[in-house]
Amino acid sequence: SEDGTLHILVATSGDTGSAVGSAFHNVPGLDVTILYPEGKISEIQEKQLSTFTGNVRALKVKGTFDDCQRLVKTAFTDEDLRKQFRLSSANSINISRLLPQSFYYMYSSLVVRNRIAIDSKLDNPSIISIVPSGNFGNLTSGLIAKEMGAPIAGFVAATNTNRTIPDWIATGNYNPRPSVETYANAMDVGAPSNYERIKAMYSFEQVKELFASYWLDNDGIKRSIAECNDKTGYVIDPHGAIGWKAWDAIRNGDMEKLVSGQKNDFEQPGLTPNIPCWANDIVNKNAVGIILETAHPAKFGDIVKDAMGREPIIPSRLAEIMELPDRSIPMENDYDLFKDWLMANLQK
């Protein structure tokens, strides 16, 4: 039956939860429960999650994003819950989350292709999407767009110290691990769930041809925020800074060094050692990058100030949220306790 409330369970590492909560707040027939890792997101991010009323509530879990994701995934396979409640997800484990995201890959790549001859005087360049990545849902949306015909030649997976996918691309060994806290906290994912989708869509050899991968530690993130501002005047957040630095390095010598035979140490921040099929287009200066920026820098004011020497301006809508009371609910990293809470609080 499709009668009754649809309960959305969503794990967030910082940004997904507030977007989902805002989209579904006060929507009749929908109920939203957001799980986020306590103490591992910025103050503004937490305020965006913990101040909802009505049909949206936030559980702050004593654990990591991977723990939050595990609780949500386990709930979806729990027969007791499935019999009593209509459950769905707004995470990328739900394909309905990925399909709309694929549209902006399609749109942006078509706009660039149609404008490039006017703006850059390049002749049919390769279009590369540079994607700050944690759980790899966003990048997987780009892969879907490419398979639907978007004129994208390749992707750069830009990650922080949680470099499970870059290490896989470098070695062929997929080794999920506990996540590590970084300045780019929305990407603090040690076991990306979309690895399974990527592996289902492409062979490992195809992945190495399609992807470059680039990672930074915290010091590199701060330097990149400052470098981006110095070179472009743009104030960028920690996640976008990794994407910006990845493209800046790739098109200014790093890819050319790989093509010429230099071996990269993938244990050090930077580019993984595989050479994608579009590498020569980089060397020949016949490639254009589309860098995805994922968050407002004001959500990471202390980090940006430390990097640039000044705080980013906080938009009024974020400043207003900071004045609202915290309504988050503490939750242990224990599935039985989480299940008990759901059974007691969800409405049929």
Identify what each model region corresponds to.
Residues 1-261, 270, 276-348:
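PLP-dependent amino-acid enzyme catalytic core
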